[in-house]
Amino acid sequence: MESRLGWLTELQTETGANLRRTSIIGTIGPKTNNPETLVALRKAGLNIVRMNFSHGSYEYHQSVIDNARKSEELYPGRPLAIALDTKGPEIRTGTTTNEVDYPIPPNHEMIFSIDDKYAKACDDKVMYIDYKNITKVIEKGKIIYVDDGVLSFEVLEVVDEQTLKVKSLNAGKICSHKGVNLPGTDVDLPALSEKDKSDLRFGVKNGVHMVFASFIRTAQDVLTIREVLGEDGKDVKIIVKIENQQGVNNFDEILKVTDGVMVARGDLGIEIPAPQVFAVQKKLIAKCNLAGKPVICATQMLESMTYNPRPTRAEVSDVGNAVLDGADCVMLSGETAKGNYPINAVTIMAETALIAEQAIPYVATYDDLRNFTPKPTSTTETIAAAAVSSVFEQKAKAIIVLSTTGDTPRLVSKYKPNVPIVMVTRNPRAARFSHLYRGVFPFVYESDTESEWTKDVESRLNFGIAKAKEFGMLKEGDTIVTIQGFAAGVGHSNTLRVLTV
C-alpha cells in the first residue's frame, strides 16, 4: 500500500522528460504584448493568457487578443486560451487637494466621509470614501485598510449617515484613489459595476474563453455574471475569485454554480489575517478537487522575479506547495505583465510544477477522491474514474479522450492520473478552456466527420496517438486507456478500452 512518507523518500528531484500537467497562466502587459514574446512564453510553458481589466483601454486589450492569436499562427503548438479578469466592484478613496500626498503620524484622528464635496478635496483632516453604505455596515472598533493595508485605521465613532471618525494605527500618507478594505465587515456592493458589464460584453464579442470574476461574495453574483454574458457567452467559463471573508463564508454555495475558482491571495490576505491564508488555500483547493472543478492559485507566486532573474526559495516552495495542494493552474501577474524576466519566470514556474508533480502520491490521492465523492456518480464520471484506475493497474502511459464539450476530460482530470490526458475534439473553444483542467493536453481535430461512426472514432483515436507521439508522451509498445462514446453527440462517453500503441 502506498504511503505518503514512503513515496517522498523515493522522490526524484530531476525534471526528466515527463510532461508538466499543471497549467500556467500569465498576465500580459507592455513587456510581453507582442507575438514574438508570446511565442517565447508559450514555448516556456504558458497555457492561458490573462488580461487585467483593472488597467488598459479596449484598444489595448484588443491588441493582446490579436497578438495572442497571431502567436498561434507563428507557433501552432497547443491551443492558447484567453482569460478576461474583471476589475470588479471596489471601494476607493477620493482625490487629494492639488493631487499632493499628506503625511500622517500614528494615532492621528480624522474624518472619513461619503459626502461628494470631499471627492476631490481629501487631505489629512478628511478623506472621501466612494462606498455610500459604509456608515450603515461598519461598526465602532472595526478596522479599515487603505492602499492594500499600507495604512490602517480604527473606527472611533459612526458620527452620522455620512461620517466616520477614525484613528490611524500607523504612520503613512493620504494619497489619491487608493483601494479600501473592510475586513470583518459584510459589504453590499453589486456583483458587477457598469464598467464590468461593458467589459464582459467586449470579451464575449471578441471570443474570450473564460472570465476571472473579481470580489465574488455570493452564488447570486455568479448568476448575475452568467446573465450578463448572455446566450452569445454561454460557453464562456466563469472562474470566481475568492478574495474576501464573505466569499470564504459562502464558498459551498458559490462552488455549486461556478465553473471554477481562483484563490486570489492578495486581497484575501488583507481581508482575513495573513496567517490564515495558507489554510484557507488548502481548504478551498480540496473542496474544488472533490467537486471536480478547476482551481487556480494566484498572487505573488514569483513576485521577486519582476525585478530579479532568480526567485526566492520561499517563492519556489509556494509554487510547489500549490501543486501539492491540488491546484490545476498557477498564475503569474506582474512577473509577466511588467517584469524584466517574464520568460524566466514562466520557465521557473514550469520546472517547479513538474518536480512538484512527482511528489504527489497519485494512488492515495485517487483513493481519497473516490472514497469522498458522493455516490452514485454519473455514467461519465464512473467511466472517468475507471480510466484512471486502469492507468494504475495497467501501467498505461496516457489516457486519450474523445470529447465534444470538454466535460469528460474535466472528470478524468478530477481523479488526478499520473499520465497525460490527451483530449481530441472538434470544438476549438473546448480545447482552449480545457487548459483549466490539470493534466489535459487538448488537440483540435479538423478533419470532416466520417459517415460511419466507428471509422470516425478510430480516425480521431489515431490522431490523438499521433499527437501524443509528436509531443513525447507515447512510443510504440506503450499501453493507453481510451474513452469515447457509443454514438455521435454530447453525453455519450461510456466506452473504455485498454490498447497497445
UniProtKB/Swiss-Prot annotation:
Mg(2+) binds at residues 243, 267. Disulfide bonds: none annotated. It holds the Pfam family PK_C. The keyword Metal-binding applies. It comes from the Eukaryota. Pathway: Carbohydrate degradation; glycolysis; pyruvate from D-glyceraldehyde 3-phosphate: step 5/5. Its cofactor is Mg(2+); K(+). The gene is PYK1. This is Pyruvate kinase. The record marks 241 as: Transition state stabilizer. Homotetramer. ATP binds at residues 52-55, 92, 178. GO terms for molecular function: ATP binding; kinase activity; magnesium ion binding; potassium ion binding; pyruvate kinase activity. Keywords: ATP-binding, Glycolysis, Kinase, Magnesium, Metal-binding, Nucleotide-binding, Potassium, Pyruvate, Transferase. It is an enzyme of class 2 (transferase). InterPro entries: Pyr_Knase, Pyrv/PenolPyrv_kinase-like_dom, Pyrv_kinase-like_dom_sf, Pyrv_Knase-like_insert_dom_sf, Pyrv_Knase_AS, Pyrv_Knase_brl, Pyrv_Knase_C, Pyrv_Knase_C_sf. Its EC number is 2.7.1.40.
